[in-house]
Regions:
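C-terminal accessory/interaction regions of large nucleic acid-associated machines
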Residues: 175-252
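C-terminal catalytic or substrate-handling cores of phosphate/nucleotide-
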Residues: 25-193
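A generic structural motif
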Residues: 15-29, 52-56, 205-209, 213
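Short active-site loop/helix that positions an aromatic residue
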Residues: 2-17
Length: 252
């Protein structure tokens, strides 16, 4: 159906009156629990299907989407080629990354750095349910996304100040993007602040201050303990990242 829609949009003068679309209706009245979801999974094979595509069927995602809509936020839970983020729009991937960085759980953040696809592999448990569960409100999701965007803006500005796109400083800012966000949010105690259930935004000056402190501590810790490590690999290593995170947080 989406293909037909795209064709019509590109060829508005073409008549679609004679098009036939095969349709199958399955009665679920006496079907087992979750049978409809399983049928959907088994039959969606006409295009490349990823676990991420079934997030839109998660009741928690639908609830969060509804709560965000009441806040004037468009939360996209379906994968779309035309999606574009804005001040009032974000998708489930951005929400997942932001929630991970706010979680205080370095193992989750390391997995996100390695690839969010692994988290979508188990939509019934694991890290996915740690991030998206009945206790996570739409307001909370919106707050962590906005804070993560602030952190990213500062990080991008710091990266642009560097005279070279190489070296330890550059590698730390680029490869350590998720670790930096985790450290900043932990330093701000964002999870506890946002968990109060109210819309809150940290002042830019406070975020910038904690960012600078976190980046400095991260550089010092890496220089002291992992000077010979390749940063691209280090920030995907859960054991090393947990050691770095715990060492830094012990000084905060």
């Amino acid at each position: 159906v989406s293909t037909i829609g795209r064709f019509k949009k590109s060829n508005p003068e073409t008549s679609m009156d004679s098009i036939k679309v095969p349709l199958r209706v399955i009665q679920l009245a006496e079907a087992p629990v979750n049978f409809g979801t399983e049928v959907t999974r088994a039959n969606n094979r006409q295009n490349k299907i990823e676990n991420r595509d079934f997030v839109s069927q998660d009741p928690e995602q639908i609830r969060i989407q509804s709560e965000l809509r009441m806040e004037g936020i468009d939360y996209s839970i379906m994968r779309s080629e035309t999606f574009s983020a804005s001040d009032t729009t974000f998708d489930v991937d951005e929400a997942l990354v932001s929630l991970a960085c706010a979680s205080g759980n370095c193992s989750i953040v390391t997995q996100v750095k390695g690839g969010v696809g692994k988290i979508y592999e188990n939509l019934e448990g694991g890290y996915y349910k740690t991030l998206f569960n009945p206790n996570v409100t739409g307001v909370y999701v919106n707050c962590v996304v906005k804070l993560n965007r602030k952190i990213e803006k500062i990080r991008n500005a710091e990266t642009s100040k560097l005279g070279s796109y190489s070296g330890k400083d550059y590698g730390t800012l680029v490869h350590g993007n998720r670790m930096i966000a985790l450290l900043v949010m932990s330093g701000l105690k964002a999870k506890d602040v946002f968990a109060k259930g109210e819309t809150f935004s940290f002042p830019d000056e406070e975020v910038e201050k904690v960012f600078s402190q976190s980046l400095l501590r991260l550089k010092e810790t890496l220089a002291e303990n992992y000077s010979d490590n390749t940063l691209g690999s280090l920030f995907k290593n859960s054991t090393k990242c947990n050691a770095v995170y715990n060492k830094i947080m012990a000084t905060v």
